[in-house]
Amino acid sequence: MNKMDRQRIETVGKLGSTYGIRGWLRIYSSTENAESIFDYQPWFLKIKDQWQAIELETWKHHNHELIVKLKNINDRETAQTLANVEIGVDLSVFPALEEGDFYWHDLIGCQVVNLQGYAMGTVSEMMETGSNDVLVVRANAKDAFGKQERLIPFLYEQVVKRVDLTTKTIEVDWDAGF
């Protein structure tokens, strides 16, 4: 396993518990379509806070779950050492997006400001709902409205007016009192 610079790696899933005695592991994908995790190669595993390259040998469906066989992981005991380890891929494997589309990892950490110039906080995570994605904004410590968190729908052009990834700023048409 080769080590990789952590700055360029994005987590796309996690290995779960072992399956069987031949080194198979359950996998939990955080990609929009669970099987899409296999489109992004090579994989890196986060072991002891270091990203290390590993080769996927094969995968399959089993009882509504996905299971994987990693190269050179041939028994249950070795596989067990990888249980609950994060799976990452180099950001360069993600396709370029169209205007107005953004990867969640690019939005997390951005400062959110409304049209009146009020600093609403920092995007701490993204949430998927049935109709649209939602910015989870952790409010600044001395928020004038006493907010700790704001949920702002990510509706580009309607609510989200501008995203500047260079300055890590998102401008929204949203009342600071909400």
Curated annotation (Swiss-Prot):
The keyword Manganese does not apply. GO terms for biological process: ribosomal small subunit biogenesis; rRNA processing. Keywords: Chaperone, Cytoplasm, Ribosome biogenesis, rRNA processing. GO terms for molecular function: ribosome binding. It is found in: Cytoplasm. Residues 99-178 form the PRC barrel domain. InterPro entries: PRC_barrel-like_sf (IPR011033), PRC_RimM (IPR056792), RimM (IPR011961), RimM_N (IPR002676), RimM_N_sf (IPR036976), Transl_B-barrel_sf (IPR009000). Pfam families: PRC_RimM, RimM. It comes from the Bacteria. The keyword Chaperone applies. The PRC barrel domain binds ribosomal protein uS19. Binds ribosomal protein uS19. An accessory protein needed during the final step in the assembly of 30S ribosomal subunit, possibly for assembly of the head region. Essential for efficient processing of 16S rRNA. May be needed both before and after RbfA during the maturation of 16S rRNA. It has affinity for free ribosomal 30S subunits but not for 70S ribosomes. Belongs to the RimM family. This is Ribosome maturation factor RimM. It comes from Mannheimia succiniciproducens (strain KCTC 0769BP / MBEL55E). The gene is rimM.
